[in-house]
């Protein structure tokens, strides 16, 4: 019998009570409360053994008729997660776990799909705790989120994998479950796609207090198209305002689930964990086993180890692989010899062999990160020579939606930044970069990202993991323009924009935006999207109008500015959005040049709509006047289109009172001192340099967005 501290949320529905009654022989310890609202008494069934629906309702009505202010509670303060399934071995018997007998029918590969903060990492922690894959004293919040940045932000940035062992109670057999914890933020959707490629099934986790979010729907559709079996789970049912019934209604209408398929859980309290693992065994099919074919595997992730070189995470499709086997990475035709293979538990542990259907890692003593690409196929060398190997389906190339320049704070760190980006791309294949040069920041790279959060995380990883500080220019999107000579080019920054008069037609990217919001926020969010030049497409209602899905077409440049922050603010944190697809529409663009004392500051120039050029130019020079420190000479700030200045301001010179000691006497003496000072300032203005602080880039971007 399983013991749980369990609180079913305020306003629990009849449907929720019926679903709770289906969980077999579960003893619930009570939690005291003074609330007496209908349905709330399902939260506490102190020491009742619940085996059927009739007994459940009898217990609830008994509690409801209790007139005392505080219900009596007996609680030993413990939470037992051992459940009906058991771990196959205690920690310390690592060799038995790693090199266990192989049985493809008792293998399951699955990932967790959920929006940010819906509880997927906490659920993964409960899996590890229940199956004793990790010692209880080692378990900490977000255990699989091993990056310091992930713990600080409370989000998953990198996919993580772990092999866990679970004894299925109905047949007593031990099953190998390969769990992959995936990111939920839209900017890291590429990580979720790679997880899906390595699995046959997925647990779809939805926060019962917030409902289904837009990004969850998008990722789930990708999983369905890939043929994955989904297991729906409503999480956080211990929270008093969990709306279980509405969440179930949304799941059934969006994905055609039956109510019986949907599981309820509280990852925080450990309720429903056994039922989820049982469903993984029962519903997700085992991988296809092809042991008789030559070895072939898909590289779905990788990282760089200073001692081993490139460590590739693979899903083995065919055959077996072991140490000292000769392989070929088909993408770059790289021949190499395997130095080690193993599994993630979740730490990397070596084993003797990897077989068809398994998820693991391999090292080939490759030191060049650029030679091993995520999505590549690795195959046995002998089979490649016999032309007996076809590449597995690779991932679609990354298409960045946001571009920004990264320049080292110290000009001598250019090569260090180059090496750091190469190693980072090994772990995050969606980053694209190419060398660039700025008249202000010097040599650096123009980089492409999936969004502003992706950009921010990359900058912080460069600082923390590689100790390389960078200057970030204002983010932009890829524009297209047709020149008067008929040539079409793509431009992502002002530095590469053609000269004024050469462009015949310019175009900006638009995208399809899906916004999911509470029903009472409809007017505010619609007005926001209209201000962003958005075009309404469709509105859908869920849960009787409590939840709305709005579809708009919006310029990409508007999405990457402050839309996310504004949406969260207007919806009290409950709004979410997703965007996909790109189309180009005509717009009259121009390059807004920034001149400082007559010289162009290329790093601060930007592309703007010609209709807004005068407003943007004025705002730009006003912002620069606030962030550029004054000198002993006058600094002229100008915004120009081509050779025409459209806005101008100046920063007055610092003035020293050279006549301070001339208290009286001939006024010609004072005039002479002032003339000499003026000559000196003129000379300094001719030879002096104006230093632009690093914060100027951020200040300008914030002001114009």
From Swiss-Prot:
EC number: 3.6.5.-
Alphabetic keyword roster: GTP-binding, Hydrolase, Membrane, Mitochondrion, Mitochondrion inner membrane, Nucleotide-binding, Protein biosynthesis, Transit peptide
Mode of membrane association: Peripheral membrane protein
Transit peptide: 1-20
Chief location category: mitochondrion
GO BP, sorted A to Z: positive regulation of translation; translation
Keyword field contains Nucleotide-binding: yes
Ribonucleoprotein found in the keyword field: no
Subcellular localization, as worded in the UniProt entry: Mitochondrion inner membrane
Biased composition (Polar residues): 76-90
CDD domains found in the cross-reference section: EF4_II, EF4_III, LepA
Binding of GTP, residues: 114-121, 181-185, 235-238
Residues in tr-type G domain copies: 105-288
Region (Disordered): 72-92
GO CC term (a single one): mitochondrial matrix
One term of GO molecular function: GTPase activity
Gene3D superfamilies noted in UniProt: 3.30.70.240, Elongation factor 4, C-terminal domain, Elongation Factor G (Translational Gtpase), domain 3, P-loop containing nucleotide triphosphate hydrolases, Translation factors
Catalytic reaction list: GTP + H2O = GDP + phosphate + H(+)
Annotated family: Belongs to the TRAFAC class translation factor GTPase superfamily. Classic translation factor GTPase family. LepA subfamily.
Function: Promotes mitochondrial protein synthesis. May act as a fidelity factor of the translation reaction, by catalyzing a one-codon backward translocation of tRNAs on improperly translocated ribosomes. Binds to mitochondrial ribosomes in a GTP-dependent manner.
Designated name of the protein: Translation factor GUF1 homolog, mitochondrial
Natural source organism: Babesia bovis
Organism lineage string: Eukaryota, Sar, Alveolata, Apicomplexa, Aconoidasida
């Amino acid at each position: 019998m399983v013991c749980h501290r369990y609180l079913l949320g305020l306003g629990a529905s009849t449907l929720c009570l019926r679903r709770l009654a289906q969980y077999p022989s579960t003893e619930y310890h009570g939690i005291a409360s003074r609330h007496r609202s209908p349905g709330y008494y399902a939260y506490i069934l102190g020491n009742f053994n619940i085996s059927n629906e009739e007994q459940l309702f009898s217990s609830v009505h008994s509690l409801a008729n209790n007139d005392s202010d505080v219900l009596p509670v007996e609680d030993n303060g413990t939470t037992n997660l051992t459940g009906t399934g058991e771990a196959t071995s205690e920690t310390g018997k690592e060799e038995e776990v790693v090199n266990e007998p192989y049985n493809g029918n008792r293998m399951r590969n699955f990932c967790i799909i959920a929006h940010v903060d819906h509880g997927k990492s906490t659920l993964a922690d409960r899996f590890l705790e229940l199956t004793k894959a990790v010692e209880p004293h080692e378990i900490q919040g977000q255990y699989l989120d091993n990056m310091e940045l992930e713990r600080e932000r409370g989000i998953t940035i990198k996919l993580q994998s772990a092999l866990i062992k679970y004894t299925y109670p109905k047949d007593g057999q031990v099953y190998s479950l390969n769990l992959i914890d995936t990111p939920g933020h839209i900017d890291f959707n590429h990580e979720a796609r790679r997880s899906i490629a390595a699995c046959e099934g997925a647990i779809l986790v939805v926060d019962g207090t917030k409902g289904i979010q837009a990004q969850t729907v998008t990722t789930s559709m990708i999983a369905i198209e890939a043929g994955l079996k989904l297991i729906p789970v409503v999480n956080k049912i211990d929270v008093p305002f969990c709306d279980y019934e509405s969440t179930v209604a949304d799941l059934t209408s969006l994905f055609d689930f039956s109510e019986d398929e949907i599981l309820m859980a509280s990852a925080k309290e450990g309720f429903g964990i056994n039922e989820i693992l049982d469903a993984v065994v029962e519903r997700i099919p085992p991988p296809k086993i092809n042991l008789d074919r030559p070895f072939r595997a898909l590289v779905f992730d990788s990282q760089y180890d200073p001692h081993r070189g490139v460590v590739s995470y693979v899903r083995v499709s065919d055959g077996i692989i072991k140490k000292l086997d000769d392989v070929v990475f088909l993408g770059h035709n790289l021949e190499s010899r395997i130095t080690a293979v193993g599994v993630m538990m979740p730490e990397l542990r070596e084993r003797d062999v990897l077989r068809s259907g398994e998820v693991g890692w391999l090292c080939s003593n490759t030191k060049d990160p650029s030679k091993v690409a995520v999505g590549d196929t690795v195959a046995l060398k002998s089979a490649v020579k016999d032309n007996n190997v076809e590449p597995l389906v690779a991932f679609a190339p990354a298409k960045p939606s946001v571009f920004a320049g990264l320049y080292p704070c110290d000009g001598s760190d250019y090569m260090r930044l180059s090496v750091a980006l190469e190693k980072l791309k090994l772990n995050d294949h969606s980053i694209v970069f190419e060398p660039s040069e700025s008249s202000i920041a010097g040599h650096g790279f123009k980089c492409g990202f999936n969004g502003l959060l992706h950009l921010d995380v990359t900058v912080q990883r460069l600082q923390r993991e590689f100790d390389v500080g960078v200057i970030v220019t204002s983010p932009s999107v890829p524009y297209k323009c047709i020149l008067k000579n008929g040539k079409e080019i793509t431009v992502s920054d002002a530095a590469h924009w053609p000269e004024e008069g050469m462009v015949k037609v310019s175009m900006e990217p638009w995208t399809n935006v899906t916004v999911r919001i509470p029903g009472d926020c409809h007017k505010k969010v619609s007005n926001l999207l209209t201000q962003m030049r958005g075009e309404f497409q469709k509105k859908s209602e869920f849960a009787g109008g409590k939840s709305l899905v709005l579809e708009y077409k919006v310029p990409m440049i508007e999405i990457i500015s402050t839309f996310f922050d504004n949406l969260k603010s207007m919806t009290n944190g409950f709004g979410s959005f997703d965007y996909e697809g790109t189309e180009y529409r005509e717009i009259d663009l121009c390059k807004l040049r920034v001149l400082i004392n007559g010289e162009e500051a290329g790093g601060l120039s930007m592309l703007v709509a010609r209709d807004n050029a005068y407003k943007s130019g004025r705002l730009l020079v006003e912002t620069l006047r606030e962030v550029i420190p004054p000198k002993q000479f006058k600094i002229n700030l100008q915004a120009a289109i081509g050779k025409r200045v459209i806005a101008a301001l100046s920063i007055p010179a610092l003035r020293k009172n050279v006549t301070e000691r001339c208290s009286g006497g001939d006024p010609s003496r004072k005039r002479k001192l002032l003339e000499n000072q003026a000559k000196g300032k003129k000379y300094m203005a001719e030879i002096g340099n104006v230093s632009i602080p690093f914060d100027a880039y951020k200040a300008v971007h914030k002001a114009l967005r």
